[in-house]
Amino acid sequence: MHMGTTEIFLIAMLIIFSVPYLIWRFGNTDYYAPLVVVQIITGILLGPGIMGRAYPEYYSFVFNPQVVQSLNGIAWWAVMIFVMIAGIELDLKKAWEHRRESTITAGLALGTPLVFGCVAALGLVGYAGWMGPKAQSWQFVLGIGMACAVTALPILILLMEKLEILRQPIGQRILRYASLDDIAIWGVLAVILLDWDRVGRQLGFLVVFAVATRLFRMMMVRLQERDRWYISFIWLAACAFAADWAGLHFMVGAFLAGAVMDADWFNQEKMDFLRANVLMAIMPVFFLSTGLRTNWAMGGSAVFIVAAVLLIASVSGKLAGIHLAGKILKWGPGEASIIGWLLQTKALIMIIFVNILLDKQIITSETFTALLLMAIGSTMLTVPMVYPKLQRVAQLIFKTS
């Protein structure tokens, strides 16, 4: 029976939404693997390295080029909205109010795993197949280091909601640290993506963006909230287009679009509702499209070994940095461990970053696969490590600094 592209596309959508949900719901995985993690894992399982190898005819039928192109369009828009929300949710005002504590903690939480990750990446430079064809060594090393250092702010919010600490003082402290790290990480990414052949365009983009931002902010404060929501999506599309045209990548533009908006322009409950619905309704398509980019050509064992090394570098670096910050700031027993395990959450933001590195051919699809596995492992460790610690030191939940 012949099927058109629309019918095959809908089969793909049926798979994307049903398979991970059924695994999550009936497998009762929520403690170790929230639905978002199950969706990412399912994306990998449905990719060319696993399903494509086991059932090549079915794989090529469902995920043919026309269907993949349609899925990619949805995935691009989904991730742009998600990244914009992450930018809006940066809490830099609170970070400034507690600037000594926030700067020390965020600096060590970022710098230590960045160094550990760069050291691990230096070990990969000498082996063929890990560094992308358009990467210089420093870009590859810094990109891997950045991936090991990043904290996934939006997923961190979801996990802290699950642990019932998001609106508590410790949750707000952790958001301050993560917000500063987010800004720094996107700055590092911009340096990595600097294209000397298009540096004029990139500088032009930054100048025009600065002027446009001033005008945009002047307009937004004069609008009613209902208009702000709609205008924010127009602004998102414009910023993403301009950044991509300049060679920085559309996701950098999406983050900048959100970062220059104030969270108090929008109702917090509506913002939470938007984030939850983007995650439920369209982000699963991004997870699938991410899984379709995985590659096991180096051999499964090599990819898993590299993923394990990067996971160790990431987690140990984050915990070491936070414990050092705790000693400097004289935190109580157990405090650094809880904060460190929460801040090492990778999930979506790291996956978004490594998608950008893959797009720019700074890493290969094998490295991308290893980093994806590292992000999954990192996120699955978070709740099982933090929940028992919170039960033992419940008084920390209410500590403000």
Regions found by a protein language model. Name each.
Residues Q39-M51, I104-V119, R176-L189, W229-A243, ...:
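Small-residue-rich segments of transmembrane alpha-helices in multi-pass membrane proteins
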Residues A12, I16-R25, I44, P48, ...:
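Transmembrane alpha-helical segments of multi-pass membrane transport proteins and ion-pumping complexes
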Residues A12, I16, L35-I44, E101-L110, ...:
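Alpha-helical transmembrane segments of multi-pass membrane proteins, especially transporters
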Residues G129-V141, L156-A184, I192, G200:
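Membrane-interface helix-loop-helix junctions at boundaries between adjacent transmembrane segments
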Residues Y31, L45-E101, M219-V309:
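Membrane-interface junctions of multi-pass transporters
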Residues L22-D30, G52, L92-L163, T290-A394:
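Transmembrane alpha-helices that form the ion-translocation and gating core
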Residues H2-I15, Q66-V83, K134-T151, D197-V211, ...:
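Structural signature of hydrophobic alpha-helical transmembrane segments
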Residues M3-I11, P169-Y177, R217-R228, M271-V278, ...:
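Short, amphipathic, aromatic/basic-enriched membrane-interface segments that mark the entry/exit
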